Amino acid sequence: MSHTSEQGASRPVALMMGALGVVYGDIGTSPLYTLRACLTEFADLQPAHILGVLSILFWLLMVVVSFKYVLLILRADNQGEGGTLALLELAVRGRSGRLRTFFVVLGIFGAALFYGDSMITPAISVLSAIEGIGVVSHTLDPWIVPLALLVLLALFAIQSRGTGTVGKLFGPVMVVWFATLGVLGGWQVWQTPEVLVALNPIWALRFVFEFPVMSFLLLGAVVLALTGAEALYADMGHFGRPAIRRAWFSMVLPSLTLCYLGQGALLLRDPSAIRNPFFLMAPEWGLAALVGLATVATVVASQAVISGAFSVTRQAVQLGFWPRMQILHTSAVEKGQIYLPQVNALLLCAVLVLVITFRNSENLAAAYGFAVTGTMLMTSILAFAVLPRGSTGAKRLGWMLVLGVLLIIDVLLFSANIFKIHEGGWMPLLVGVVVFTLMMTWRRGRQLLADIQARDRQPLQEFMDQLESYPPARVPGTAVFMTLNNDNVPPALLHNLKHNKVLHDHVLFLSIRVADVPYIAEQDRFSVKRVSASSWQAVIHYGFKEDPDVPEALRLVAEAYPEIDLEPMRTSFFLSRQAVVAARRPAMSRWRRTVFSFMARNSTRSTKFFKIPPNRVVEMGMQIEL
């Protein structure tokens, strides 16, 4: 076999290993706390309770994760990319009016709730793992919170170095983790095979009919088994649909099923093991090693949501829902490996506060469920708008029925968690509302600024024709004017002519456009149009998962259009620096205008975001009434 064919054969395995390490870290560590959170509600734990809850848990895994996410939602890809914002772009494509606004609001709120998830996952995962030392010895209980804080501090501290090197270990670590789950659970099931009856959905239905109110409230805890389901969809672009599906059905689902059944088997024999059924499955001689492995696995799970928060923020910036932020690439090879210092610092502070405030994983469980079910519900509604598109007749009706049933399940899960708002669910709700408000305020403010500039616009073609007829003094070199709308005269050009009364020999009007697809092919990167004898328009296109690099794009333009003269040392960039002031009849309320102004002042400067050399930039200040 040739080297190339060997590489081709090994690639699916490598992708599957990567999916195990990144995609399934969150859902793979759920057994640490899920069953305990479900069954602690029962004062007198009976076999019927254990088997009923196990049956509900198993069939939710099958319906929500296996069927909804792995088989259906993964079909809704935006050129291979997944995630809430990618799904939002598909949902609004070709739509307008109130329906478009409705989907935008849903998608943005779903993305906002993800930040709550990104804060809770590291806290609850690491806490639940280190709580295992309390099983080893109760004298170690006071060390649980300090050790969790140390692990989390170390995790966030290494983010700036990138996850490339550590990431190579994630796959093998999670293979060992899932194998351990299967072995521990399988051994317990072997000792108490009666637990296997929980795989029969009759037990779930019987439990629901016997304890209807308890069953509904219990959904708020059972949903913890589904945490990380969104990661399957969000990380589709990294590993592809086939690898994610193979990893789920070949290893993750069997291991999780055995682990949950194993905990149930242990509880059937010894209901007092409810204090920590996961760690009590292990023999005493292996407890310390299991605590260490669990801690590493929860670090992997935490890394997945931290990286996810970085990716979601970059997409929000590119799509115009968030101000520009510093984005650092931590790998010269993998363009998806990025680091956002401000996001990392905010997440770290939030996670540390959560650990210090809630102090154990059981207290955090209520907060976790609300964030998870909220995001899942938003995804289902958007999928309802995307997946049936293009279908007709019976096929479309089939899609609507299936998605309708799944939507009802998500509504039930979300509704059950509403009752836990006072227990901790308020935290992700508060985070979601704050982030949603900030994102919508930024989008609204930018739209108002664009409308004001459009209202005061001067047609570019007409203006440049006048300059050619009545030319001002010319200076050597090329001036690049950054503009939102290439059809209108940039304010920076007007200010330059007003104050400096000169124009460069060559003028390029440059716009950046972000498409609703993740990546743009190099041959479609830019378009150029001549405006006058000495001026041109250029539009540079990027996908919402790409980082703008203006000098590199202009290098490509210069190769194709040498007459523009874009030699770096003879090129100056003219940018507008806008300051927002109150208008007599403001278009925004005072508090929103204050928030928008604060976000604008603290956004990353255009020079850094677009990678423009600072020594080649001239900024023209201007005030805009809002």
Swiss-Prot record:
A single GO cellular-component term on record: plasma membrane
Catalytic activity, as annotated: K(+)(in) + H(+)(in) = K(+)(out) + H(+)(out)
Pfam family, one: K_trans
Annotated disulfide bonds: none
MF terms in GO: potassium ion transmembrane transporter activity; symporter activity
UniProt membrane topology term: Multi-pass membrane protein
Main location: membrane
Location of the protein in the cell: Cell inner membrane
Keyword Transmembrane: yes
Keywords: Cell inner membrane, Cell membrane, Ion transport, Membrane, Potassium, Potassium transport, Symport, Transmembrane, Transmembrane helix, Transport
UniProt superkingdom: Bacteria
TM region(s), chain numbering: 13-33, 53-73, 102-122, 138-158, 169-189, 207-227, 248-268, 277-297, 338-358, 367-387, 399-419, 421-441
Statement: the UniProt record of this protein carries the keyword Transferase: no
Function: Transport of potassium into the cell. Likely operates as a K(+):H(+) symporter.
Family: Belongs to the HAK/KUP transporter (TC 2.A.72) family.
Name listed for the protein in its UniProt record: Probable potassium transport system protein Kup
Gene: kup
